[in-house]
Amino acid sequence: NDTLRKAELGDTSLVPQAEKVLDQLNRTIDTPRKMWEPAMVGAYYAVPDVIAGRPMSMRQQITTQDEVSPITVLVVTTSSAGIAAETLAKRGTVILALVMALSRVRPVTLQALCCVDGYKDGTGETIITSEINTHPLDLATACYVLTSAGFARRLTYGLATELNHFRGGWPKGFTYSAGGGSYYDKLIPRLVTDPKRCLLIEAARLNDALLVNPTEWLNNQITKFTTNEEEMV
């Protein structure tokens, strides 16, 4: 069917909309990384420097701010039935713009997440991850997965039903009215090896900030992400 075809081949019809949003975003995105520098005291000796009698013959690790640190972007595509397909499409174009911006300056890993209930395995939870090629960024697939209600509600919900008896609810431990913050905090370490450099975009809501003011949301996410890393490192 059309959903399966586009899931395989992608769909670029909304890429121009994402590019319009991207045109309004003009900032450099920095994240810290670890590097070694010469020092009088440090973790180990640089043998050539010792032989040469250089005073800065040891190496110490420092944190620098640059544009090479990899970022993992997790996008929850699950949504309440009250969220219209048009709203999901608009939301997806803004998220695509963010991914496009990040991928221009550093390695990015992009995954779409289906987070629903499930009763076959007794956990009350089904997580389906869909990793999208970002080296280089597969615009067609990213655009379709991020903007399509069909991908989320037909394909991933169908898989969840088949694999783990999805019954139409949110996963165990998730409270929609509370925003799901604590659930996501516990989910991130289960999915990525470096939670400090992970940006999770939560399930769609009618009052999403990214829908009200896309440019402001993009800038806020980038600022928040960078600030969090500076505090955690």
What are these regions (language model features)?
Residues 1-72, 77-233:
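Acidic, low-complexity intrinsically disordered regions
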